Amino acid sequence: MRKVNPKVIFTLTAGRTGSAWLADFLAQNYQATSIHEPLGIEDFGVRMPDIKVMRSFNNYGNNNTVQEFWERKLSLIQQNSYIETNHTLGKCGLIENLYQTPFAADTKIIILKRNIVKQCSSYIVRNDFVHITTAWQWYLHPSYQKKLVNHTPFLKFDGVGLALWYCYEMAARQAFYKLAYSSSIKMIEVSLEDIVTPKGANRLWQALGQFGTCTLPPRKNENQIQAPKSLVQHLKKITSSIQFDADEVAQQALNDGFSFENVSAAA
């Protein structure tokens, strides 16, 4: 199988969306190192954003704290290719700090989505939105100043509202980045449900500029505890009642002048 050098690949995704599996898929087919999340003690603040970076970006925007993190991280990308599917990066300035660098022309961003009911139920059974520090490090929180989706309508969904808000916020951010930056960085939009099939995986492989067929690694990082059927039905009922168009939300934000590059001062 002929392979083209992947150059630089990152993802824009929410987490619990198949990013670990995607890292294995890319490693297996490129026969190259593919990082999911660098979690060594010394990685935080250098290769992996810490809570300060995550909170700074989502409260104040792309400020000095965030930019200094990205200067450190991007300075480590020196080899011919670099692949990382870490979902936290897109929530703390990946696009803003990449699109004007020499890497941008050779970078591909995989916008990875998942069925919203499966995605949301995964967060809930793991209690991902019970402790605020988990949301600070890995996800987002509605208390942040910079957000695209109003969280107030989700408050009535007791027990699932935070996780649901996060799903819609990330869908809006994916649409926002695609609208605002896809002319500067190549973006490839896929769903987990599609790329774990042979046909879908091959479509992704070809979208990455590759030739021939690819192979699929086994499933990875799946929840050990299955979501109760009652939870799944509850989420299906809620999501079917919500009128939401991520592209419309993103376009309105752009029309209103929203940008994470507009930095606000700390209180």
Residue spans for each PLM region:
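A short acidic, amphipathic alpha-helical/loop segment
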Residues: 94-101, 203
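PAPS-dependent sulfotransferase catalytic core
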Residues: 1-77, 219-227
